[in-house]
Structure formats: structure tokens, C-alpha cells
Amino acid sequence: MKIRRSPKKSRPNSRSTASIIRSVVRLEERVWKTAQQRNARAFEKLVPSDAVMIFQSGIVLQPEYLATMNERTISRYEIRGVRGFMPNPTTVILCYEALRLGEEGGKAFPSSPVIESTTWIKRGRRWVAILNQETPVSG
């Protein structure tokens, strides 16, 4: 796995904001790792039951994603150009390009990269990913 951060960083308005964004980027990386490992328990700590994922194949709610997790193989992934911003103190939005190789239900993932956007919110003392959307990069 390779992770390359964008040289153009968003301009946080404080060190605290920058630190929070860095922490949330690490959580996003953990989501990818737990999905690759098919670790449902760790995944549901990061992605709650009311989360929505919008994939090229359609809209998937977290319970459905977990139920089909073993049908999905992420053999390799790469995250590039991560950018984040905080529109308010309890929300972080990340955008980046992802390349993922693998298959679901016997069909290979589309081979082109996607632009990913994930909205993280703070619930109590924890950050959770509540919305993820992938958009194909045309080419």
C-alpha cells in the first residue's frame, strides 16, 4: 500500500485544526485497511450503522456493506493527494484520489482511479465517517 499526500495542503486556520485534520486522515487510512482486512468489528467503530457509501455500483448503507464484506477483496489500494477542511468544529471533509484493485462478487473493480470524498463528524469523543462518495475519474 502506498499513501502519498498532496503537496498542496489546505490552509487550516489554526494548529488545532491542522492536527484534527491529520488525525482524521489517519482514521480514513484505517478505514481502508480494515476494509482490506475484512475486519467488520474495526470497520463499524469507524463507520457507524447510519453511514452511507455511494459507489459506482450504487448506494450502500453500512449494514449492507458489512453483510457483503466477505464478497469483496481489496488486493491493493493507493491513496493520493489527500486534502481536508473543517467547515465547523465537528465536521471534517476529506477529498483525495484512490486507486483500488480487487473484486466483488467475482467481478473486478473498475480499473480507473476514483475521487473519494468522506465526511467525518464528531460524535461524543470519537470521529466517525458518516458519508463516503466515489466519483470515477474519466480518462
Where on the chain are the PLM-derived regions?
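A beta-strand edge to alpha-helix "cap/lid" segment located at domain peripheries
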Residues: 2-139
